């Protein structure tokens, strides 16, 4: 007896606007360049880390004048934002309001970690961590780098 099998292959096309947006190396380097330009204009020196949404390092730069541990701190800030989805500046308040939060993995309660959202503000694609100056200056550097790359620091609803 012969059996006949019919295989039906269905492909589904995802609309362009719904396709996955990722943080590539070229874009990460543009963020670093924008942050560096901002820092130089302010006569500051930062260590900058750019990670994807999984917290994996995509680009980094330690500007002249920073100590050896500063790069690690920048990466920790970026990875904290990748893990939690909100700026490190807000983690201090979250730690005050939520007992035990400060003991959770990847929590950094110092400003300088900022999320990276796609240009349309609909997809979180990574994070930037900057360290080496006052926390507010670190955050401003990260935000300037993100803006220079044509991306957003927050979601657009």
What is the meaning of each model-derived region?
Residues 16-157:
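Flexible, solvent-exposed loop/hinge segments and secondary-structure transition points
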Residues 6-8, 102:
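Compositionally biased, low-structure terminal segments
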Residues 11-15:
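N-terminal signal peptide c-region/cleavage motif recognized by signal peptidases
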Residues 4-6, 16:
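Cleavable N-terminal signal peptides
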